[in-house]
Amino acid sequence: MPNHPLAEVFGFPADNLSPEAERYRLNRLCPYHNKAPSCTKDKAKDPLGVCSIFDGASVAITCPVRFRQDWLIIEDAARFFFPANTSWTSLQEIRLNDGNNQSAGNIDFVLVAYDDRGRILDFGALEVQGVYISGNVRRPFECYMEDRLNCKDMQWTSTRVAPDYLSSSRKRLAPQLIYKGNILKAWGKKQAVVLHEGFFSTLPSFPQTAPAEADIAWLVYGLELDATTNRYHLQRRRTEYTAFGAALDRVILPSIGPLETFVSHLQDKLDEKLGEDHAPDAPALGDILSEE
């Protein structure tokens, strides 16, 4: 694997310097159906055109727009939401209000089923989860954009750049499930969540249910490199179906460790504060409980 974090820049692998790839970079274009022809990530006038970064031997999708390749995510979500042969379309960035008419956030895509007169029959909500980045990825990006020929194989050691799966779960995925997810569940509407396989692997395992009984479909994708064209292609790795409550609990509730470990840690800190030469043994859990 390269010794720099840049997997894809403006839609193409960093070592792809073909005329097509260079045209996208020169014009700062997005090949994956952004709301505008150009990339608008981070700054509209100076976009951070990094679609994905290396994560060890894998590639992590960091831009949610990257998932729009070939519109596979829309097709896969529709298959979960609606029966076969249903007439449907997708709408982007739809505001969702709560019972107090306050915004609970925008839904990335709402897929709408309709009859032959254009009247809504049903709908489902599709959320797309990119991954936060820890470290400064703009610096290697700018270095690459200034001299792509010499920087495509650069060794980048100035900053450590990596996907931040924990923050992505706590700051993005969990709030979306809590606020928007609860409203949609109360309405009896299905939800689909799109994630990269690396992100999904960091989540707790979910109790599975049959597709027909599920509230949520977790659509898990990866990137496959085509060596002939030197381009990555989005592929669905698997789909997992869950009930809403079970999924929410697994995402928002922490894994609870033993009390003894925390008490031992407290004892170490207390020993440091008191400056004891001979620290007492940490009390057992049974001793603590018997004194209460």
Model regions: which residues?
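Non-catalytic C-terminal interaction segments of nucleic acid-processing enzymes
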Residues: 1-41, 152-292
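Feature targets compositionally biased, intrinsically disordered low-complexity regions
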Residues: 10, 48, 146-147, 221
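Short N-terminal secondary-structure initiator segments
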Residues: 72-107, 206, 215-239
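Short amphipathic alpha-helical surface micro-motifs
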Residues: 44-46, 106-111, 174-175, 201-202
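Short beta-strand-loop-alpha-helix junction that forms the active-site gateway
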Residues: 127-150, 163-166
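Active-site metal-binding core of divalent-cation-utilizing nuclease and nuclease-like domains
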Residues: 64-66, 76-138
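An N-terminal, globular interaction/scaffold subdomain
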Residues: 12-83
